[in-house]
Amino acid sequence: MSSDRFGLKRFVFSRFAGSLCDQFLLFAVPLAILKATGSLTFSSLAFVIEWLPRILFFPLSGFLADRIKPRFIFFNVEAGRCVLMLVAFLTLTFHPAATFPVLAVMMALLSVAYVLNFVATEALLPRHISAEALPKAHSMLQGVDQTTQVLGPALAVAISVYGGVGAILACAAVLFAVSAINYLFLETHDLEVAEKMSLRSIVQSNITAIQVLKQNKILLHLCALTWVVNLVYGAALVVSAAVILKEFHLPESYFGVLQTSAALITLITFFFVPRIAKRFGLSTLGTLSFCGMILSGALMSLSLDYAMYLAGYALLMAFDGAFSVYLRTLRSQIIPQKHLGKTMGLIGLMNMCSVPVSGLAVTALAGRFMPLQIIAIILVFALILGLMLVIIGRRTFGYNSWLPPVIAQPQA
């Protein structure tokens, strides 16, 4: 099916609307909970509540994406998110004291929708677009994600000035509704599935994914490295709102500037990532990104003012994006293509576990340490664990570089 017949531009538009809403909420919810409760503990606990359903749903989402018509998935996900926004908006309008439970439950349900949308997108494009058009399609989606990371916080600040988190929820409901209606006009074909959907088929799909991991143990090594990176990344996401409001005593608009600046730096970084990988090799890209994240985290933890923290946070997010490119490229050369979906579902589950773990760590430390001290503690732990993994990986798999290089051609 050609991209014109499928409606790639229509799909990208809906992706833009949905991603913009995601960025609205990622900006507004932590601030709303922190302002309502005055506690970093509740803010980090909400982060954990959001991420747990996300990681648990990864294996099932890959299974569903291989069996259900894509248009049906996308429409129902967006329609469900629209209804959820309206319910949250009405509940907070009549019961403003219930901010924490309402927003925590809302984000948990949204995280499930996000995972299904993400995995369904990964399965959709190769089935509806030619191999020659895939790079362009992925570039368009990457551009959408980076653009909304810039626009989202800035627009959320402007909207919240007039109506707080309620106005953001109402705007998100409208955008999700527009996105859902737009998805109805996509031309997607039904999937040919010989095996009926059952608990047994779900279990068998994940058993196959486990076998792939056993046969390619370096994938487990990459998962462990991802854990280390996500510990630092997750801690930065959880703590940043408290750093801005409590340590630097700045208004919440500065949090929007922080997010927008990070997205801009990340967008600029992606122009250099392919050149670095081509000239110096994929392993060098991974090593530079990993070291850059550690140094950026150190800059954050030692920040004396907002400008230092902004620089460290923006660089951390940029290097995290570059490290993700390294991981995705290497995984695609190791995992057999026929098992890519189910294996990525299982890998996604393992990788994402580290993000709520960082939230739990912040929750445990919040009562005894200041936000910047929490970042420093988690950073030191991640550095020690990362160095141990580098040594173990070099000895186990026999490569000479700091991180695993390209070791195989894509498998069929």
Model-predicted segments: where are they?
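Membrane-helix boundary and inter-helical linker elements of multi-pass secondary transporters
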Residues: 35-36, 66-67, 96, 127, ...
